Amino acid sequence: MSNFKSFKKVMITTFSFLLILLQYSCRNKNNFPLKITIASAGKVQSIDPARASTIKAHQLLGAVGDTLYELNIDGKLVPKLAASMPVLSEDKLKIIIRLKKNIFFHDGTPFNSYAMKFTIERFQNIGTMNYLLNKKIKSIETPNEELLIINLNKPSSSIKGLLTSINLTAISPDFYKNHFNKFLNDKFIGTGEYKLESFSNDLQTLSPNNNYWSKKPKNNGINFVGYNNSSTLYSALRSKQIDVLLSNSIEDTLRYKLKLLSNQYKIHEGESKPIEISFISLRTKIKPLNNKNIRLAIAKSIDRNLIVDKVSYGLRNPARSIIPKVLKK
């Protein structure tokens, strides 16, 4: 990043997803917890992969659907619906992907290359951000049920993003055949370990997919609940109305209180690698910040660690880039 850009956006900290969990008090005869309630701020407007654009919608899709590949904690591709790693042609214009066998959608229809082609072409047709994909993909070939070939317009440096995109979560062509040209916001048929039971903007209920092709869920389902503000979320966790809180949904003051409870072993805390950042932006069009030398001086003298301690109670880490490390790989 150039010096100029580093002043325009002074990085404060990376943003971690923390999972704050309570002990499950209710279990069934198989010793599996009853439905787990996961809470976060905001609403889900759509579960249609072609439209979903928020982190909350993506989390929901990750539970009910599968992509061709996923990224592991080191940022490397791991086959999901794909049977092996993708093969790139010598001219880097073809991505050749072999698919797993004996995978079925929630409606009982088979997953295959034709279904994946339908998924991609539907997104190209109506996807909210389809312009990003249409610039990359020239055409799609399906020589047989287990082979998918993606032809690119030109060599791409973002193949990982293409193959792991949650917006390309596989969907059933039979179920979506009447929605190739329009969104289906409140229903979903995919291949994931959970099935969508019911959908509203505030509450989404999932049940286990007993025919899931990989490891089966070890619970009786999930309730995704949306709350309006931090205080309500915090109170719901303290009163045991919810089991899991995605702590990026609450203010740092309350997150700090939860951290103290975790230190006292009253709740369980899990932390993932950061995938978002927060920053302070300087108004560079007004004096004296329109002076590059002033911005240089600020950048060299600013105490990022002090800001982290005072603003976020030390819960975040200083950063010098607008791109989280996990997304750079």
Language model regions located:
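C-terminal motif of bacterial Sec signal peptides marking the signal peptidase cleavage site
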Residues: 24-25
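N-terminal lobe/hinge region of extracytoplasmic solute-binding protein
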Residues: 39-88, 121, 189
